[in-house]
Amino acid sequence: MRSSLLLGLTVVVLLGVIVPPCMAGQALNKLMPKIVSAIIYMVGQPNAGVTFLGHQCLVESTRQPDGFYTAKMSCASWTHDNPIVGEGRSRVELEALKGSITNFVQTASNYKKFTIDEVEDWIASY
């Protein structure tokens, strides 16, 4: 009887530890279209620059000789201790940009550079 109780408690504790990151990932996935849209909007504004969570970022794309666009997003002043560069590639420039933004945000999230609450506040203030 004791071993089954101990096993049950172990499972509950493990679920408590494992579930939150998954939920955070799901929350970020739900917010991702809004994040990408906001940053794409900033990219399209002349002389506006790109600011994500209060950090100045660079989002750029280049057309390659093979007809594909490659895009990169970085926020050097924010991630200088652990450089993060989001990368995207597509035949469509907008899709390459979206890919680089998504890749950057997911990587920054993996390195715990922000919380979901911070992203929600940033979206609400935008």
From Swiss-Prot:
Subcellular location: Secreted
Tissues showing expression: Expressed in the ejaculatory ducts of mature males. Not detected in the ejaculatory ducts of immature males. Not detected in hepatopancreas, female reproductive tract, eyes, exoskeleton, subcuticular epithelia, heart, gills, stomach, muscle and hemocytes.
GO cellular component terms, semicolon-separated: extracellular region
GO terms (BP aspect): defense response to Gram-negative bacterium; defense response to Gram-positive bacterium
Keywords annotated in UniProt: Antibiotic, Antimicrobial, Secreted, Signal
Location (main, coarse): secreted
Signal peptide segment: 1-24
InterPro entries: Anti-LPS_factor/Scygonadin, Anti-LPS_factor/Scygonadin_sf
Coiled-coil segments: none
Function of the protein: Has antibacterial activity against the Gram-positive bacterium M.luteus with an IC(90) of 125ug/ml. Has weak antibacterial activity against the Gram-negative bacterium A.hydrophila.
Name of the protein in its database record: Scygonadin
